[in-house]
Amino acid sequence: MAERANLVFHNKVIDGTAIKRLISRLIDHFGMAYTSHILDQVKALGFQQATATSISLGIDDLLTIPSKGWLVQDAEQQSLILEKHHHFGNVHAVEKLRQSIEIWYATSEYLRQEMNPNFRMTDPFNPVHIMSFSGARGNASQVHQLVGMRGLMSDPQGQMIDLPIQSNLREGLSLTEYIISCYGARKGVVDTAVRTSDAGYLTRRLVEVVQHIVVRRTDCGTTRGISVSPQKRTLPERIFIQTLIGRVLADDIYMGPRCIAIRNQDIGLGLVDRFRAFRTQPISIRTPFTCRSTSWICRLCYGRSPTHGDLVELGEAVGIIAGQSIGEPGTQLTLRTFHTGGVFTGGTAEHVRAPFNGKIKFNEDLVHPTRTRHGHPAFLCYRDLYVIIESEDIIHKVAIPPKSFLLVQNDQYVESEQVIAEIRAGTYTLNLKERVRKHIYSDSEGEMHWSTDVYHSPEFTYSNVHLLPKTSHLWILSGGSYKFSVVPFSLHKDQDQISIHYLSAERRYISRFSVNNDQVRHNLFSSDFSDKKEERIYDYSELNRIIGTGHCDFIYSAILHENADLLAKRRRNRFIIPFQLIQDQEKELMLHSHSGISMEIPINGIFRRKSILAFFDDPRYRRKSSGITKYGTLGAHSIVKREDVIEYRGVKKVKPKYQMKVDRFFFIPEEVHILSESSSIMVRNNSIIGVDTPITLNTRSQVGGLVRVERKKKRIELKIFSGNIYFPGERDKISRHSGILIPPGTGKTNSKESKKLKNWIYVQRITPTKKKYFVLVRPVTPYEIPDGLNLATLFPQDPFQEKDNMQLRAVNYILYGNGKPTRRISDTSIQLVRTCLVLSWDQDNKSSFAEEVCASFVEVRTNGLIRDFLRIDLVKSHIFYIRKRNDPSGSELISDNRSDRTNKNPFYSIYSNARIQQSFSQNHGTIHTLLNRNKESQSLIILSASNCFRMGPFNDVKYHNVIKQSIKKDPLIPIKNLLGPLGTAPKIANFYSSFYPLITHNQTSVAKYFELDNLKQAFQVLNYYLIAENGRIYNFDPCRNIFLNAVNLNWYFPHHHYHHNYCEETSTIISLGQFICENVCIAKSGPRLKSGQVFIVQADSIVIRSAKPYLATPGATVHGHYGETLYEGDTLVTFIYEKSRSGDITQGLPKVEQVLEVRSIDSISMNLEKRIEGWNECITRILGIPWGFVIGAELTIVQSRLSLVNKIQKVYRSQGVQIHNRHIEIIVRQITSKVLVSEDGMSNVFLPGELIGLLRAERTGRALEEAICYRAVLLGITRASLNTQSFISEASFQETARVLAKAALRGRIDWLKGLKENVVLGGMIPAGTGFKGLVHRSRQHNNILLETKKKNFFGGEMRDIFFHHRELFDSCISNNLHDTSGRSFIGIEFNDS
């Protein structure tokens, strides 16, 4: 009883850990037997008390946490604000997703932490509370789902579903929540079956690869090892111990002079502790990788058996054990037992908070601005940063680790508990990160704009994928495009206003073309792809009625459907204006599908005076047949200018043009066939044939006449001259006339009746033999050349254009020299005469005009149609701003310039009507031109994509000074402000717009110094006007809907009247073309604007074309071209971002499988196969061919094996599954043990492309004494199991019929070495007890001795070369040349292979 008094009385709730402690103390005191007796009594007591308490779980015991309501409400409020930010374009979709996930995750976690205090206060003996904290059943996070909120779920792929389940299981789920819950629940209703079968199939494939691996020897005699260093703490302690225990040493280990462990000794805990204590040199251990055979393994390379802790027994089927060990956790873990039913758990960042109110100070050089993962502005610090918080009397110093975000600015005042920095969650979440792509799709249709330069990503140079260099917005400018294919002529000009009724009326006259560009889907015109290419007939009667009888020289766009000139379009700086001639006089339409004006700009974009601007191929001078051009004895001089050098894909071609001084020339047709040497010709030289005579087997003549056959280099030229043959009487008379043109009206020289000729003829003398000759009279087509087709009339005249400034001279060039033959290629036609426009200008005013001018194409695009303008700058600019490829500062300034090298696709360029004359009017400045200092006023035109406007000359001094001042400060300012779609004209008298019919007031400043009086003096036109074709000016109501050239825009008009005192603090300038995000305040009491682009600015109102911004961060990929029309649902951007995975094996299994099947996991990760190719090439280059292959393959295989083992282990460890390395090593050894015979050195033994075992390749090479070239290759497990040596095993795995048929054709032999083959055939498996007989038999029969001539050839030479690389290369050295029973033979055991 005295003892009883000394006992301590505990009155405490006892939980799992306390019970453990109690039991261990009981065992120490009383031993096992007595303890078990005591525990039985405890158990009985427990049951008795539980019965008495009648603890049961009822639904009433699930108490919801009272704070849940407002916590959820708060989270919803935050989500709403986030949604708004996304709508305004402040954060992009990925940032929004991340932030919303973290908001809900934090809410859910907070609720979980609230749960315990809540139970403790309200009901400490609540059965649910007792159960969840006893450790007996259930844990806090499961109970949290019952009484807190279920939270975020992950779908079967482990992706987060960003809609959280707000209810808990006590309240019950809504329908949506239930479906989401099914995805993520344990034994999930949605995906368990699929997962389990996946895991089973993985196990099956793994076992298939390694089923034949059995322990067959005690020691294979290898000298290699893999070194593990205890000094470099790259591995965590636990993993280091796991790696060593149970392995066998490959080398002796010395500590100074003393040997502390010998080769082939297995490592136990004691040895590991000594290694760790002594920090010895790297320890070399044997692993399955070092074992010398691929078809079995020896005891020492395998090490200890995991079951009984001793060296593995002979005959143990370690392959199957390895396959099962890797596959089995997969089957277990698919059930999602790991986490509570797929509920998302991720790490959020730690926050550093300010301890008291004060001012922040830090070194600004150590940080640089960035965006946080949620899109907030922050500073990123590179190294440890000390932040000092100063208040009046206290100074506090906070150390912030590198790679953290600082959320405050220098000298900012912070309040107590304000978050000043965010420390990224530590390494424990690193293995739960993965990189994924997310595509963002467009919500509305419209036109694409971006506000910064973009790069082409290198692998997509010619497509529409661009990379963003910095954070910027992508804008989708709203506007529905009217889908007619192509407008064959366009009466409305760019930015006219038309009513919808007119559009629908016009649609009937539009023919639909089907255009298919196989590279990119162009939305230039929605095309009807019809299967039959049917020619459509235009209804021209209607068309004529529309055009009317007036001034009918139109050039209108038509798409060349199938046109030879498309080739010309593909050259960089050449554009074609296809047009049809409408001849007004005869009221008939001559339609030539091939006619068009082609303009060509020199590569550098500089025209000299008198250079050719454009050329026009007149269809009248086009021939379908070959022939010779003649223009008699009249003089012609050929001109070749520098501008005519066409650079096409880097090859320069100089094409001479012949300028004619004559008014006519002659074309003598002939039929030409160019045949290859080998073709058999069915007609003789100088014979006369009729029409449709077969010439060769598959060609027939199209005309009749005389045949001439000439043999040139490697080809035969066969000509057929049509015409009549005369045999002249007197020889000398004809010789004078040989090869001349005879005009009509003269008599024939050699005929009796002197008949007058009606047409021109060409007389040619032909002598088939020396004595015999005759004359061939050939028909001639004469061509008249007028004094030049006056192309100037094709363009409507600009009434205010100064005619004497820019001159266009039309000159006719003949393209073929006198007597030069013209050749027709396949089905194209030959152009004989080209009419060229020669550009020149007056040089009266020396100051303003230069010898050279800059020219460039500007593409202006309105939805559905592209317009290209030629821009010629006559003004000598003082300041040049030339766009560089990645210069961000000019991003808003530079229009989309066609002469720019960094261009997009110039293949389709459609010219619109009446554009070119505009380019020649006086003084067109460009974006290159700033205000010219020596003139009073200067006009400036900027054509940017789909935004065109023109600033006229400013005569008003006040306004001019403002601009001058701003130029002095920053010369780029005025251009920024002036960029915009519509223009201004101070005086209508000196500016007539032929293709900007909308003239608007340009810019209204809201600044104080810009008062309305000044504005009225500067700009007399305050409303905008429409100028009709005949020069009348219409003023119209600004509130009407405005349509941009077949594009329906959504307009938004804020009306507000400015007052003088109205904006004293703010001095915002609204400029044309500016993009405005939603809710930006322009002025204090001004309206809140919707997002869009400012289109028209007036004194009292602005018009905004509504647009939707999408934010994109650096590294994002933009799809589509600038200015392209996008439709709803098109892909806009692709982001690549890191995200937390839910810590669940749902990702584990696919990942393991991807590694084992050697598939690239995603486009970003390094692909192992690529790495292997690189290794192979480098080593071979360094060491030359034979050694390079041996060593290259060895090194590659060693590298990739270690890499693969680490990858697989990483996946399993992240799921908390411990698998011993040696199991993975056995599998990896099988998938890396094959090499691919390459074609570099052709050997007699193996075919190129054959897969053979690495050791077999080495041994064959030694036996043949010649190098076999091979390179390492990674097989996936499926391929490896279909490339084993046993066809029975392969056939039982997959593709049975194929494998058996192949084996039968090749006559393959199965040696029945694996387990599976023997099971299939009902034999005894060669493992366990059935193992001994196999070895005994093979020793007797399979030792075939081959005599070798050079005994020590390999041993000596290789040792000299590679003695210092012993660890890696000694596989190929002496040990393979073991002596059998004293004679010099090499024993090759075929059961090894």
Curated annotation (Swiss-Prot):
Keywords: Chloroplast, DNA-directed RNA polymerase, Metal-binding, Nucleotidyltransferase, Plastid, Transcription, Transferase, Zinc
Native source species: Gossypium hirsutum (Upland cotton)
Oligomeric form and interacting partners: In plastids the minimal PEP RNA polymerase catalytic core is composed of four subunits: alpha, beta, beta', and beta''. When a (nuclear-encoded) sigma factor is associated with the core the holoenzyme is formed, which can initiate transcription.
UniProt catalytic activity: RNA(n) + a ribonucleoside 5'-triphosphate = RNA(n+1) + diphosphate
Family indicated by similarity: Belongs to the RNA polymerase beta' chain family. RpoC2 subfamily.
Record's keyword annotation contains Nucleotidyltransferase: yes
Enzyme Commission identifier(s): 2.7.7.6
Pfam families, per database record: RNA_pol_Rpb1_4, RNA_pol_Rpb1_5
HAMAP family attached to this UniProt entry: RNApol_bact_RpoC2
Recorded name of the encoding gene: rpoC2
Protein name: DNA-directed RNA polymerase subunit beta''
